[in-house]
UniProtKB/Swiss-Prot annotation:
This is Lantibiotic actagardine. There is a cross-link at S46-C51 (Lanthionine (Ser-Cys)). There is a cross-link at T52-C57, T54-C62 (Beta-methyllanthionine (Thr-Cys)). There is a cross-link at T59-C64 (Beta-methyllanthionine sulfoxide (Thr-Cys)). Has potent antibacterial activity against some Gram-positive bacteria. Has good antistreptococcal activity. Inhibits cell wall biosynthesis by binding to lipid II and blocking transglycosylation.
Length: 64
């Protein structure tokens, strides 16, 4: 590892403020309040149940 790579850290305020991308990935932190509202409708119809079939015992487990 080069000394230059060690020097570049997202904890360094000057580097962080001058950066054009976020270390968590492109588009991180760009959700608006409208995107986060809980009263929005879901995209796909759902009954609220999630079911899975267990291979070991062959039973169906559902949870709400």
């Amino acid at each position: 590892m080069s000394a230059l790579a060690i020097e570049k850290s997202w904890k360094d305020v000057d580097l962080r403020d001058g950066a054009t991308s976020h270390p968590a990935g492109l588009g991180f932190g760009e959700l608006t309040f409208e995107d986060l509202r809980e009263d929005r409708t879901i995209y796909a119809a759902s009954s609220g149940w999630v079911c899975t079939l267990t291979i070991e015992c062959g039973t169906v487990i559902c949870a709400c």
